[in-house]
């Protein structure tokens, strides 16, 4: 009887250590997956902008489709609660919500990516040199799972902008 009680106590102690560690690892893994998806979206946007001219949206601008695999809830993974894409805030922005971005003000050709996974903190990454914006009049907010985006290089008031929207 003492052996059974000892075994149960040992299992409870091990579970008390393993479960939080697994949750923490899941949050870290999901944050890394979202960061990788953001980097891929930025790379695809830059490639589109570098190889083409911006045209008005009604003149068949250059386009590219991109499929992102964003984390969903599961064992040892935290689901993406929200990923938003748009212009940076008007205040000085930084990486992961910091007050500054290496002491410089973000330029007008910048994009802000903001995300949070379940159990994690909100992250903000501002990428300078590329304007990725939701389709005019829309918002671009993504959640976990497979998402296919269409990127179009459009000219808006003479400025090159990557217009992003969900396909379909």
Where in this protein do the model-derived segments appear?
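Intrinsically disordered, low-complexity regions enriched in Pro/Ser/Thr/Gly and acidic residues
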Residues: 70-168
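General N-terminal targeting signals
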Residues: 18, 58, 83-87
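Generic structural signal for short, flexible, solvent-exposed coil/loop and linker residues
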Residues: 11-14, 23, 27, 55-59, ...
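Hydrophobic alpha-helical segments
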Residues: 1-50
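Short, glycine/small-hydrophobic-rich surface segments
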Residues: 50-74
